[in-house]
Amino acid sequence: SNGDALYKFVQNSDLYWLTGIDQEDTMLVLFPDNTDEKYREILVLVRPNELKEKWDGHRLNVQEARQISGIETIVWLDSIDALLQVWIHNADNIYLDTNENDRKGFHSETREYRYIQEMKIRFPLHNYFRSAKISKELRAIKTPYEVEVIQQAIDITEKAFRRVAQFIKPGVYEYEIEAEIVYEFLRNRASGEGYSSIIASGDRARTLHYIYNNEICKDGELILMDFGARYGGYNDDL
């Protein structure tokens, strides 16, 4: 964003589902047919840097990454290109992850798109496939643990709803209602909103994706609310 402020980081959902790592510049390489068994499952992280950590906070070390992900082989991002050069010559097919959300926009090239194009230039004779199609099918079946996490997101959202049900009265602003919701999310250890909350009073309730939330709520008006907590990588939607 403007100046030296940063947009809040949100991890790729497939990567988080596979590794549990919630840190930027992370990659996962899976090569089950690698002749070197050590490099069949590789987690790629940014090398910890004392100066960068002073500004941006702690970065995972090898032991921490292993504990979170269950992956033994950890390599640093600045060395992955040289390793890929060796591994890829022993493979015929390359699967790359892409954001296949049906509502995704195409206004600008994403980092992942540029990386895919770079791979095709570096290794033009390989066969390329979509890993997102596979992960989408796998992620559709939730484990008991995932169900517990989703239920926690639901429970936090319910607490927020009950809070605002007691708070709402004529004369409050839509953004005050949103503030109560976010407060309840954060105090219950949610990472925040799953998406921008809609608090639409009066005529604004007819706007499907109204997100300004800056008008006063008047006596007798309907208030349309659409919000949900994000917890453990899962969003609720009320």
Segments the model singles out, each with a brief description of its role:
Residues 1-159:
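A composition/biophysics-driven feature that prefers long, compositionally simple stretches
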Residues 35, 59-62, 167, 175, ...:
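Short, charged/polar low-complexity linear motifs in solvent-exposed/disordered segments
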Residues 162-172:
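C-terminal helix-coil-helix/basic helical segment that borders enzyme active sites and/or dimer interfaces
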Residues 80-84, 164, 181:
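Generic hydrophobic alpha-helical segments
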Residues 3-9, 117, 129-137, 141, ...:
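Short catalytic-site patches enriched in acidic/histidine residues
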Residues 34, 164, 234-235:
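Short amphipathic alpha-helical leader/targeting segments
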